[in-house]
Amino acid sequence: MDPSSKPLREIPGSYGIPFFQPIKDRLEYFYGTGGRDEYFRSRMQKYQSTVFRANMPPGPFVSSNPKVIVLLDAKSFPILFDVSKVEKKDLFTGTYMPSTKLTGGYRVLSYLDPSEPRHAQLKNLLFFMLKNSSNRVIPQFETTYTELFEGLEAELAKNGKAAFNDVGEQAAFRFLGRAYFNSNPEETKLGTSAPTLISSWVLFNLAPTLDLGLPWFLQEPLLHTFRLPAFLIKSTYNKLYDYFQSVATPVMEQAEKLGVPKDEAVHNILFAVCFNTFGGVKILFPNTLKWIGLAGENLHTQLAEEIRGAIKSYGDGNVTLEAIEQMPLTKSVVYESLRIEPPVPPQYGKAKSNFTIESHDATFEVKKGEMLFGYQPFATKDPKVFDRPEEYVPDRFVGDGEALLKYVWWSNGPETESPTVENKQCAGKDFVVLITRLFVIELFRRYDSFEIELGESPLGAAVTLTFLKRASI
């Protein structure tokens, strides 16, 4: 449909009676049949529109204004990345911002708008950290995930099954320490405590928007109505801070050159590694394992052949960037995992001025100051863009399918674009894609196939391995 021919439509939906309706909506969002997906789907069907007004949790008393304009289609969603039209200040977590007492008193990079001078300094610091670690990524990943798979094999041999998530989190943080700082955190004062420390600290940041599976009469007063006091987590946070302060010397020296005080740099490094990177991998690796596991042995055979063939022909028996580029199916299965189940479902942006947005069917007027909210799992399953959108299609992005990558937005921007100091796209976008490919590569270098069981988890999939078939060639 030509944009000029799309009818101008008033944004449907209402926010209801202040205070009472946001609480009612919060209860529906967390405890209604069908969960948050149904919260959005029912309204989309009611209003016959993928753009509508609604309240977003947490609401009272954590958030002063729960009102948002919801975007659920691939046409309207990208407005959230246009920083000329939307402001990104203090809305990383949505309609509320966690206390800066949880981040050393600083507004860390995720909460800064690109227009703020500190944004460019801190993002350049992360670019330096990524570049400085580039030569360590592949060898340290291989070392760490060989350790992981050896442990899983031993557990499987002993008990007939092996839970992936907890040991996977240990491996992920061990790898990040080795890759970024040339330091195995398990050989420091942290020991193996980092994943538990991080999860506790993240809970204090995100509690108002999390569903931990508790009964509503416990979860509502404890998590969703008032903020958890920051002082309760201070000693936990300080243990993480001390680790990064002790190992991140080259990054801190670069921070001073960029005009960022060392203390502020450490808090930002901690947030980037623990919240952004570890938090993403904690969800993404089990999800990827889940989808590939469910796809079955035929896909496993194809991946094993592609991966081993490329390593032999282009890497002289080793994993290299050149060899990885010759693995189109491997790349596609990672992108498809990121499409069908993006690790961070919500994105927000506040209108800088009056402007119009388009869905596939209509045009809508947005007023300055209104909050836009995109629920990514709907936008990346838009049936007007993707064939069989609800299915995991392993080769979706192979060949001509690469054209669809502009609709993959897990990184807070299109997969076809790159992070810069001028945008809010994830600084580690390419790093996360690379290590997820490496995860698939190490899996199929070692095994011909595997089988899994799935369980419940508040974040992502809980995966248990029930069978590992060692590589036959």
UniProtKB/Swiss-Prot annotation:
An example molecular function term from Gene Ontology annotations: heme binding
Binding site for (13S)-hydroperoxy-(9Z,11E)-octadecadienoate: 199, 282
Positions annotated to bind heme b: 88, 119, 123, 424, 426
GO BP term, example: sterol metabolic process
Gene3D superfamilies named among the record's database cross-references: Cytochrome P450
Gene Ontology CC annotation, any one: chloroplast envelope
Keywords: Fatty acid biosynthesis, Fatty acid metabolism, Heme, Iron, Lipid biosynthesis, Lipid metabolism, Lyase, Metal-binding, Oxylipin biosynthesis
Family matches, as InterPro entries: Cyt_P450, Cyt_P450_E_grp-IV, Cyt_P450_sf
Statement: the UniProt record of this protein carries the keyword rRNA-binding: no
Pathway(s) where this gene product acts: Lipid metabolism; oxylipin biosynthesis
Enzyme class: lyase
Cofactor(s) demanded: heme b
EC numbers on record: 4.2.1.92
Keyword Lyase attached: yes
Chemical reaction(s) catalysed: (13S)-hydroperoxy-(9Z,11E,15Z)-octadecatrienoate = (9Z,13S,15Z)-12,13-epoxyoctadeca-9,11,15-trienoate + H2O; (13S)-hydroperoxy-(9Z,11E)-octadecadienoate = (9Z,13S)-12,13-epoxyoctadeca-9,11-dienoate + H2O
Family classification: Belongs to the cytochrome P450 family.
Function: Cytochrome P450 enzyme involved in the biosynthesis of oxylipin jasmonates, important phytohormones acting as growth regulators and signaling molecules for plant defense. Functions as an allene oxide synthase that converts hydroperoxy fatty acids to unstable allene epoxides. Catalyzes the dehydration of 13-HPOTE ((13S)-hydroperoxy-(9Z,11E,15Z)-octadecatrienoate). Also catalyzes the dehydration of 13-HPODE ((13S)-hydroperoxy-(9Z,11E)-octadecadienoate).
Protein name, UniProt field: Allene oxide synthase CYP74A2
Gene name, Swiss-Prot/TrEMBL: CYP74A2
